[in-house]
C-alpha cells in the first residue's frame, strides 16, 4: 500500500511517497502563510509548505524492451528509515536490480542530501541511453496576501557552468531552453525557494525550464513549475548521481554564506548600482540594527536618517542654489516680461548672464537629485524582497512586506485597486508638500509651468502604482519626504542667512566675470541653435517674398 515517510530537523520537514519515491511535501518550520499567521488558535497554524497538495514529483524516464518506464508510476519500498535518513528502492520483477533514492538530512540544515543509484539495471535499461531524463515538477501554493505580486515575482532561476545566474520570465506562462550545462536550478517563490544542485558536475544541456498557471488554478495556487533535466548513466552494475536539495527562505546572508550564488535570486535591482547600494550599504545597516533587536519600523527610520546624513552635503548645496535662484526671482521675472515668446534664445542668454554675474550654477540643484535617485530606486527593489519584513507589523500595518489596507472597497478602481493603503496616502501627501516647497523657488515661464504641472502629476501616478506595494517601501518613502521637508525648513530658516547671501551675490556681480568652461559651452550651443533657427526660417521668408 502507498505510504508516506517523513524526515525532519529544526528547520524543515519533508515527506516522501512510496509511489514514485520522491518528495511530495516540504515545510519550512516556523513559517506560516498569510492566512495562518493571524489565527488565534495556535494549534491550527500549520507550517508553510512549498508544495501544493502532494503535487511534486521527480520522474525518471527510461526504456525497457522499447517500452517507456516512468518512475513516478513505480512503487518504492523502504529499505532504511531513521529520523534523518531514508532509503527507497523500486525493484525489478526478479529483484535482481533496483532504482534507489537515498535521502539524508543533517541537523539544523536547509539542505537535503540526495543520492540516486541504478543497481543491476545494465541489462534492463535499453542500450543507447547514456543519459536518463529527470523531470522535476511542482505546483506551489499561494503563500502571501498579494497573489498578483507573488506570481509576478515567482520564476525559475538557474546557474550555468560558466558561473552566471539567470532566470526565465516571471509570472504566468514562460519557457526557456538553456543551452549550457546547469549547476543548479531553483523553483523560486516570492520569499521561499527550493533548489536542486548537481554535486561535482552539472545537469547536461539542454535543460528546459517552464512555469505556467494550471488550467484549474484558483486563488489558492501560485504557479506550476517544470524542469526537464537529465542525469548520466553508464550501463555499469552500479551507477549513481549525487545531488543536494535546498528548501529555504530567501534570506540574503544565509544564502550568501553557502557560496553557490543562490542569493542572486533575491531581486536587489537590475542595474548594478542599485544592487551595490543594497548589498554593501542597506543590507549591512539593516542587519546591524536587526541584531540589536530593534523593531522594523524603527530600523527603517534609522536607515532613512543614515542615508539622509550621507547625502546631506549635496542637499545643502542644492538648497543654497535654490535660495540663490529664489533671490534672483524678481530679476528673472523682469527678463520674462522683457522678451517676447519668439525671443526665447535671447531670453535664455540673458538669464545665463544673470546667473554668471550672481555666481549661480543653474544645474547645481540637479546633481543632488541625480545622486538621490539610485537610493530611491534601490529601495524600490529592497523592501518588496526583504523577507525580514514578512509578517512583521508596525503601527496599523500587519505585514510590512505587503500593502497596509485601512479600507477594503467593494469594487475595484482602475489603476488603483480595491483597497486603501494609508502609508501610500501619507507618501503621496508629503511628496506633494515637498514638491510645493521646491516649486515655489522655480523660475516662471511657460516651460517652467509645464514642469510644475508634471511635478504635481507624478505623486498622483505613484499613488496608483504603489498602492499595492510593500508597506515598508511606502513607509520609507514617507519618512524620506518628512526628513527632506524638515531639512529644507531647517536650512532655509536656520542655516542660510538670505541677507548675507544677497550681499555675497552682489559682491560677485562687482567682480570681473570669467566664463566657466561649462557656461562657455552652453552659450556656444545656444548660438548654434540660434543659427539653425535662422537658417531654417530663411527659405520660408524667401518663398513668402516670391509669392508676394
PLM regions: where:
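Soluble non-transmembrane domains of integral membrane proteins
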Residues: 1-264
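Helix-loop-helix
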Residues: 16, 114-117, 143-149, 199, ...
